[in-house]
Amino acid sequence: MNGRYYTADRGDVVDFLRSHGPFNLALDIGCAAGRLGKQLREAGIVNSCDGIEPHPAAAGMAAGQLRRVWNRDLADALSETPWLDYDLVILADVLEHLVDPWQTLRDIHDRARPGARLMVSVPNVRHKSVVFPLLFHGRFDYVDAGIMDRTHLHFFTPASLRRTVEARGWKVRAESLNIKKKYRKWWFPHRLLGPFLAVQCFLLAEK
């Protein structure tokens, strides 16, 4: 198990959701060791959080942080999960790893209760670190971590993420870009070049 990945700080997700809560009960899909759920609870954004995590060791760690954890692949957990209990479903850097993220978004939509919110974050393949090597050198190289992580099966831009989510029945309510602080100091490049400077894109949708 990559301990760094499974225990990573998710303050970025907390910051995005801070102005959209509070929520009663969240479901964190791909919850890793449960750190995000713990952070959301401590920040007062959710009252409680459940998780789905396929990796046994990570699921065991998450069980100590979350109310309930299913050690299952998402496809196997679909029928076991009490979807109507959740007013927030989280897919934080998960879609890019799934074989069929489109069907996953549809399955969750069909099972979620009316008014439930879906939070999605994905790496932004429009980032300059990907675009410039591709444009000027024809390079599209996979690496061990980051936007071009070799475990990523799919790639999204802010615009394609929105279209993907909306096409599966969700109504997008909020969007944001994760831009490094050094770029946020200047209004002009931040506003004009945001899609090229953001390492991640965030989205909140409603059923």
Feature-to-residue mapping (PLM):
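Conserved N-terminal segment of class I S-adenosyl-L-methionine
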Residues: M1-L84, L88, W102-L105, V122, ...
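Adenine-nucleotide cofactor-binding loop residues
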Residues: A75, L95, R126
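A short beta-strand submotif of the Rossmann-like class I SAM-dependent methyltransferase core
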Residues: L88-V94
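Short N-terminal helix/helix-N-cap motif within the alpha/beta-hydrolase-1
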Residues: V99-Q103, V130
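A short glycine-rich, Lys/Arg-flanked "PGG" loop and its adjoining helix->strand segment in the class I
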Residues: Q103-R117
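Conserved class I S-adenosyl-L-methionine
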Residues: V120-D141
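Acceptor-substrate binding/catalytic loop of class I
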Residues: V143-S160
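Substrate-binding/catalytic lobe of Class I Rossmann-like enzymes that use SAM or dcSAM, i.e.
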Residues: R162-W170
